[in-house]
Structure formats: C-alpha cells, structure tokens
C-alpha cells in the first residue's frame, strides 16, 4: 500500500488507504461513544489519541532504520503523508460526531 508519491499508483492507493482509515476511525469513535456517554468523550479520545499516536510516530520515524528497515525513502514519505491525514481525521471525526448530537 505504501507507494512512492512519484509513482502513478500513489493517489488511488492513498485514497483507498484513507477511506479505510476513516471507516475504522468512525467505527472506533462510534463504539467508544456507546461506552462513554459523557459530554465530549469522543473529542477527548481524539485529542489524547492524537497526542499519544504522534509521540509514537515521532519515535518510529526517529528510529526508522530499526523499526522500518525495508522502507524506501518514497515509502517513508508516503507513510508520513498518510499519517498526517490520519491524524487530521482523528481530530475532525470526533468533532463531526459530537456536532451531530
């Protein structure tokens, strides 16, 4: 799935990966909303989840040769692009779900 952004297959793969990420995040937030019905529960999860995830991704990118030794530079760029978009969704989806209430 991690295709070099310079390749022609990058955009379709990226859109498919992004759609899958959005679906999984919607499901996670929907289930969490059923478990914790307090006000702003999903927003708190989005903020804390993003903070923890960004820290973990920072460490993984910092130690790239140890954690992802087989990735090319293009794949690392593709991973970083997906990661930024995923965290954007991780912050926006809870706002959308909270607004619908």
Swiss-Prot record:
Give the UniProt subcellular location, in the record's own words. Answer: Cell membrane
**Primary subcellular site in the record, as a coarse category:** membrane
Q: Where are the transmembrane segments?
A: 10-32, 45-67, 77-99
Q: In what way does this protein cross or attach to the membrane? A: Multi-pass membrane protein
Pfam name, any one? DUF5367
GO CC terms of this entry = plasma membrane
Question: Is Transmembrane one of the keywords UniProt gives this record?
Answer: yes
Keyword tags: Cell membrane, Membrane, Transmembrane, Transmembrane helix
Where does the source fall among the domains of life? Bacteria
InterPro entries per record: Uncharacterised_YnzE (IPR020509)
Q: What is this protein called?
A: Uncharacterized protein YnzE
Species of the source: Bacillus subtilis (strain 168)
Per UniProt, what is the name of the gene that codes for the protein in this document? Answer: ynzE
